[in-house]
Amino acid sequence: MDKVEALQPDLVIASLSVPGMEKNIEELKKRNLPYIILNPAHIFDIADNIREVGRSIHRVEKAEQVATHFMKRIEQIRLLTQNISERPRLYWEWWPNPIYTPGRTNWLTDVSELAGATNVFADYNTDNVKSTHEQVAERNPDHVMVVWCGIEIKRIKTSMITDRPEWQQMTAIRNNNVHILEEGLYCRPSPRLLEGLEQLVNILYPSLGASLDSQITTPSAPPKL
Protein backbone atom coordinates (compact mmCIF):
# COMPACT_ATOMS: atom_id res chain seq x y z
CA MET A 1 0.00 0.00 0.00
CA ASP A 2 2.98 2.31 0.49
CA LYS A 3 3.77 1.93 -3.20
CA VAL A 4 0.19 2.77 -4.14
CA GLU A 5 0.26 5.89 -2.00
CA ALA A 6 3.60 6.94 -3.50
CA LEU A 7 2.02 6.96 -6.96
CA GLN A 8 -0.50 9.60 -5.81
CA PRO A 9 -3.35 8.09 -7.85
CA ASP A 10 -6.34 10.15 -8.87
CA LEU A 11 -8.49 7.07 -8.24
CA VAL A 12 -8.01 3.56 -6.92
CA ILE A 13 -10.41 0.95 -8.31
CA ALA A 14 -10.83 -1.63 -5.56
CA SER A 15 -12.59 -4.99 -5.52
CA LEU A 16 -14.08 -7.30 -2.91
CA SER A 17 -14.17 -10.37 -5.16
CA VAL A 18 -11.18 -11.90 -3.37
CA PRO A 19 -11.38 -12.70 0.38
CA GLY A 20 -9.25 -10.42 2.52
CA MET A 21 -9.53 -7.34 0.30
CA GLU A 22 -11.38 -5.55 3.09
CA LYS A 23 -8.02 -4.85 4.73
CA ASN A 24 -6.88 -2.99 1.65
CA ILE A 25 -10.02 -0.86 1.72
CA GLU A 26 -9.31 0.09 5.32
CA GLU A 27 -5.78 1.11 4.36
CA LEU A 28 -7.12 3.29 1.54
CA LYS A 29 -9.39 5.02 4.04
CA LYS A 30 -6.57 5.59 6.53
CA ARG A 31 -4.39 7.14 3.85
CA ASN A 32 -7.21 9.28 2.45
CA LEU A 33 -6.70 7.85 -1.02
CA PRO A 34 -9.62 8.34 -3.43
CA TYR A 35 -11.24 5.02 -4.33
CA ILE A 36 -14.35 3.24 -5.51
CA ILE A 37 -15.31 -0.37 -4.81
CA LEU A 38 -16.61 -2.64 -7.56
CA ASN A 39 -18.28 -5.81 -6.32
CA PRO A 40 -20.53 -7.24 -9.06
CA ALA A 41 -22.47 -10.41 -8.32
CA HIS A 42 -23.75 -11.02 -11.85
CA ILE A 43 -22.30 -10.57 -15.31
CA PHE A 44 -24.91 -7.92 -16.06
CA ASP A 45 -23.66 -5.81 -13.12
CA ILE A 46 -20.37 -5.29 -14.95
CA ALA A 47 -21.99 -2.84 -17.37
CA ASP A 48 -23.06 -0.73 -14.38
CA ASN A 49 -19.51 -0.96 -13.01
CA ILE A 50 -18.17 0.36 -16.30
CA ARG A 51 -20.55 3.30 -16.06
CA GLU A 52 -19.52 3.93 -12.45
CA VAL A 53 -15.86 4.07 -13.44
CA GLY A 54 -16.78 6.45 -16.26
CA ARG A 55 -18.54 8.80 -13.87
CA SER A 56 -15.61 8.69 -11.46
CA ILE A 57 -13.05 9.65 -14.11
CA HIS A 58 -15.35 12.04 -16.00
CA ARG A 59 -15.65 9.82 -19.07
CA VAL A 60 -19.40 9.26 -18.95
CA GLU A 61 -20.04 9.16 -22.69
CA LYS A 62 -17.15 6.81 -23.41
CA ALA A 63 -18.16 4.55 -20.52
CA GLU A 64 -21.68 4.31 -21.93
CA GLN A 65 -20.25 3.19 -25.27
CA VAL A 66 -18.18 0.47 -23.59
CA ALA A 67 -21.10 -0.69 -21.43
CA THR A 68 -23.46 -0.76 -24.41
CA HIS A 69 -20.98 -2.80 -26.47
CA PHE A 70 -20.59 -5.25 -23.57
CA MET A 71 -24.34 -5.80 -23.20
CA LYS A 72 -24.86 -6.06 -26.96
CA ARG A 73 -22.36 -8.91 -27.17
CA ILE A 74 -24.07 -10.73 -24.31
CA GLU A 75 -27.45 -10.35 -25.99
CA GLN A 76 -26.08 -11.73 -29.27
CA ILE A 77 -24.86 -14.84 -27.48
CA ARG A 78 -28.12 -15.22 -25.53
CA LEU A 79 -30.10 -15.18 -28.77
CA LEU A 80 -27.83 -17.86 -30.24
CA THR A 81 -28.32 -20.26 -27.35
CA GLN A 82 -31.85 -19.49 -26.14
CA ASN A 83 -33.51 -22.34 -28.06
CA ILE A 84 -31.11 -25.08 -26.98
CA SER A 85 -33.32 -27.66 -25.27
CA GLU A 86 -30.84 -30.22 -23.93
CA ARG A 87 -28.53 -28.13 -21.81
CA PRO A 88 -25.33 -29.68 -20.45
CA ARG A 89 -24.82 -29.54 -16.70
CA LEU A 90 -21.60 -27.87 -15.58
CA TYR A 91 -19.61 -28.19 -12.39
CA TRP A 92 -17.24 -25.27 -11.82
CA GLU A 93 -14.33 -25.81 -9.46
CA TRP A 94 -12.77 -22.70 -7.97
CA TRP A 95 -10.64 -24.53 -5.47
CA PRO A 96 -9.88 -28.24 -4.95
CA ASN A 97 -9.26 -28.66 -1.22
CA PRO A 98 -11.66 -27.92 0.26
CA ILE A 99 -13.87 -27.75 -2.80
CA TYR A 100 -15.43 -24.39 -3.58
CA THR A 101 -17.87 -23.84 -6.42
CA PRO A 102 -20.21 -20.98 -7.44
CA GLY A 103 -23.87 -20.95 -6.44
CA ARG A 104 -26.98 -19.22 -7.77
CA THR A 105 -25.97 -15.61 -7.07
CA ASN A 106 -22.66 -15.75 -8.92
CA TRP A 107 -21.64 -14.59 -12.38
CA LEU A 108 -20.59 -18.10 -13.41
CA THR A 109 -24.19 -19.25 -13.15
CA ASP A 110 -25.08 -16.42 -15.54
CA VAL A 111 -22.22 -17.41 -17.85
CA SER A 112 -23.37 -21.04 -17.80
CA GLU A 113 -26.95 -20.18 -18.70
CA LEU A 114 -26.02 -17.67 -21.39
CA ALA A 115 -23.79 -20.34 -22.96
CA GLY A 116 -26.71 -22.76 -23.17
CA ALA A 117 -25.91 -24.81 -20.07
CA THR A 118 -26.71 -24.97 -16.34
CA ASN A 119 -24.67 -24.81 -13.14
CA VAL A 120 -25.20 -27.99 -11.09
CA PHE A 121 -24.96 -25.98 -7.86
CA ALA A 122 -27.37 -23.23 -8.94
CA ASP A 123 -29.93 -24.47 -6.41
CA TYR A 124 -27.76 -22.99 -3.63
CA ASN A 125 -28.94 -19.41 -3.18
CA THR A 126 -25.48 -18.06 -2.46
CA ASP A 127 -22.45 -16.91 -4.41
CA ASN A 128 -20.02 -19.52 -3.12
CA VAL A 129 -20.60 -23.14 -2.06
CA LYS A 130 -18.27 -25.32 -0.01
CA SER A 131 -18.80 -28.88 -1.23
CA THR A 132 -17.25 -32.35 -1.25
CA HIS A 133 -16.20 -34.88 -3.88
CA GLU A 134 -19.18 -37.04 -2.93
CA GLN A 135 -21.69 -34.21 -3.35
CA VAL A 136 -20.31 -33.35 -6.77
CA ALA A 137 -20.49 -37.01 -7.83
CA GLU A 138 -24.13 -37.18 -6.73
CA ARG A 139 -24.96 -34.27 -9.04
CA ASN A 140 -23.21 -36.08 -11.91
CA PRO A 141 -22.26 -33.11 -14.14
CA ASP A 142 -21.72 -33.48 -17.87
CA HIS A 143 -18.65 -31.25 -17.79
CA VAL A 144 -16.09 -30.28 -15.16
CA MET A 145 -14.77 -26.74 -15.58
CA VAL A 146 -11.53 -26.23 -13.63
CA VAL A 147 -10.77 -22.59 -12.83
CA TRP A 148 -8.58 -22.67 -9.73
CA CYS A 149 -8.22 -19.10 -8.50
CA GLY A 150 -4.71 -17.75 -8.86
CA ILE A 151 -3.30 -20.98 -10.33
CA GLU A 152 -1.77 -21.01 -13.82
CA ILE A 153 -3.09 -23.58 -16.29
CA LYS A 154 0.35 -25.13 -16.73
CA ARG A 155 0.38 -26.11 -13.05
CA ILE A 156 -2.87 -28.07 -13.29
CA LYS A 157 -2.82 -31.61 -14.65
CA THR A 158 -6.04 -33.19 -15.88
CA SER A 159 -5.17 -36.30 -13.87
CA MET A 160 -5.62 -34.24 -10.68
CA ILE A 161 -9.31 -34.30 -11.55
CA THR A 162 -9.79 -37.57 -13.40
CA ASP A 163 -7.98 -39.69 -10.79
CA ARG A 164 -10.33 -38.78 -7.96
CA PRO A 165 -11.75 -42.14 -6.85
CA GLU A 166 -15.18 -40.73 -5.96
CA TRP A 167 -15.64 -39.45 -9.51
CA GLN A 168 -14.90 -42.52 -11.60
CA GLN A 169 -18.56 -43.09 -12.55
CA MET A 170 -19.32 -39.44 -13.20
CA THR A 171 -20.52 -38.64 -16.73
CA ALA A 172 -17.96 -35.86 -17.18
CA ILE A 173 -15.08 -38.16 -16.28
CA ARG A 174 -16.28 -41.10 -18.38
CA ASN A 175 -16.75 -38.83 -21.40
CA ASN A 176 -13.43 -37.02 -20.93
CA ASN A 177 -15.20 -33.71 -20.45
CA VAL A 178 -12.73 -32.11 -18.06
CA HIS A 179 -11.68 -28.61 -19.09
CA ILE A 180 -8.73 -26.74 -17.57
CA LEU A 181 -9.50 -23.07 -18.22
CA GLU A 182 -7.78 -19.73 -17.74
CA GLU A 183 -9.12 -18.53 -14.42
CA GLY A 184 -8.74 -14.88 -15.42
CA LEU A 185 -11.58 -15.34 -17.90
CA TYR A 186 -13.97 -16.79 -15.32
CA CYS A 187 -12.95 -15.99 -11.73
CA ARG A 188 -12.58 -12.21 -12.05
CA PRO A 189 -15.84 -10.26 -12.44
CA SER A 190 -14.65 -7.97 -15.22
CA PRO A 191 -15.33 -7.35 -18.93
CA ARG A 192 -13.08 -10.36 -19.66
CA LEU A 193 -15.98 -12.60 -18.61
CA LEU A 194 -17.27 -11.94 -22.12
CA GLU A 195 -14.20 -13.69 -23.55
CA GLY A 196 -14.81 -16.57 -21.20
CA LEU A 197 -18.45 -16.78 -22.22
CA GLU A 198 -17.57 -16.97 -25.91
CA GLN A 199 -14.94 -19.62 -25.19
CA LEU A 200 -17.46 -21.65 -23.20
CA VAL A 201 -20.01 -21.61 -26.03
CA ASN A 202 -17.40 -23.06 -28.38
CA ILE A 203 -16.36 -25.72 -25.86
CA LEU A 204 -19.93 -26.90 -25.31
CA TYR A 205 -21.05 -26.72 -28.94
CA PRO A 206 -18.00 -27.48 -31.11
CA SER A 207 -20.21 -28.62 -34.00
CA LEU A 208 -21.31 -25.04 -34.48
CA GLY A 209 -17.68 -23.99 -34.87
CA ALA A 210 -17.04 -21.11 -37.21
CA SER A 211 -20.76 -20.74 -37.85
CA LEU A 212 -21.29 -19.77 -34.22
CA ASP A 213 -18.36 -17.36 -34.25
CA SER A 214 -19.60 -15.65 -37.39
CA GLN A 215 -22.98 -14.97 -35.82
CA ILE A 216 -21.37 -13.17 -32.87
CA THR A 217 -20.77 -10.06 -34.87
CA THR A 218 -17.94 -7.72 -33.96
CA PRO A 219 -18.23 -4.74 -36.30
CA SER A 220 -15.45 -2.95 -34.44
CA ALA A 221 -13.18 -3.38 -31.48
CA PRO A 222 -14.80 -2.51 -28.16
CA PRO A 223 -14.28 1.13 -27.24
CA LYS A 224 -11.91 1.89 -24.40
CA LEU A 225 -12.21 4.35 -21.56
Regions inferred by a protein language model and the residue ranges of each:
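N-terminal ligand-binding lobe of clamshell/alpha-beta domains
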Residues: 1-225
